Regions:
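Bacterial N-terminal signal peptides
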Residues: 10-18
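Pepsin/retropepsin-fold aspartyl endopeptidases
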Residues: 19-286
Length: 286
């Protein structure tokens, strides 16, 4: 999915959004239905300010939430310039405060958002995307994503077969994994189109994976080139995934020393995930 900067990855906002602290709230219904595209992209309906029936892409790797510039103009948001970290440097991006954002039972008031042109989604999805919603909205409560039922359930999560620690760093959810017996920290990113690994910064540093071919991959905010690699083993907690393809990207973000890549649960064949930020737990079943 190509944006105006082909290497754009929404990872870290470098210029903080100043404004009124965001308030939160809940509605009565604890469930939210979604449509699934390309077997991993989650699209839900929601509202921003007075506008309802909007299409939002849910992405746990988006930090913070992003609104399409066309929607921001319809809402008459006061947009100010800022900087966004990308794979090959920083790009300019607008910043604003949206009066309210509603997604199923989750509501945020006076929410700081990034404003960007999301028109590149037209090439990948049959619906217009009005925004990319991150954990700053949906992470207020524990929640479960059931890919088979196409449903998100908020509130206390069920006990799933596998569980491991989850921690937030700079607004991003990180999990510790083993890649062919090497330790790595990955962003849990429901919007990533594949398992994405950043090559070591140090020239000549070894890699536990085998390079096989060049391809393009993407997360929800851009497209970038990399090389296909094959992992003999990927360990998430006690669960092992064997012979998994990944994309090795040689341009690590200059601002990123905190993690080694992105992992997409759905593309590993995971059917249910549960996230509880307060307890610091990521659980899943296959």
């Amino acid at each position: 999915m190509r944006g105006r900067n082909d290497w754009l990855l929404v990872l870290v906002i470098l210029l903080a959004v100043a404004g009124v602290p965001a308030a939160s709230g809940y509605t009565k219904s604890p469930e939210l239905r979604f449509d699934l595209y390309r077997d991993y992209l989650i699209v839900v309906r929601g509202a921003a300010g007075p506008l309802k029936g909007l299409n939002f892409l849910l992405d746990t790797g988006a930090s913070p939430t992003v609104l399409d510039r066309r929607l921001a103009r319809s809402l008459h948001l006061d947009e100010r310039p800022g900087l966004l970290a990308g794979v090959n440097g920083t790009v300019t991006a607008g910043q604003a405060i949206v009066s309210s954002l509603q997604l199923g039972p989750m509501r945020r008031d006076n929410l700081p958002v990034v404003v960007e042109d999301l028109s590149f989604f037209y090439k990948a999805l049959p619906v217009h995307i009005d925004g990319v919603i991150g954990l700053d909205v949906i992470g207020q409560s524990p929640f479960e994503i059931d890919y088979g039922a196409r449903e998100i359930r908020f509130g206390p999560t069920p006990s799933l077969k596998n569980a491991l620690p989850l921690r937030m760093e700079r607004g991003l959810p990180l999990v510790d994994v083993q890649l062919d017996q090497s330790s790595a920290k990955l962003v849990l990113d429901t919007g990533a189109s594949s398992l994405i690994l950043f090559a070591p910064r140090t020239p000549g540093a070894g890699s536990p994976v085998r390079i096989s071919a060049v391809l393009q991959s993407s997360n929800t905010m851009g497209e970038f080139a990399g090389k296909t690699v094959w992992l003999h083993s990927l360990m998430l907690g006690q669960a092992e995934f064997r012979r998994e393809p990944a994309v090795l990207v040689h341009s690590r973000p200059e601002t990123n020393d905190d993690f080694d890549g992105l992992v997409s649960p759905a593309l590993l064949g995971i059917t249910k995930i549960a996230i509880d930020l307060d307890r610091g737990v990521f659980a899943f079943s296959r």
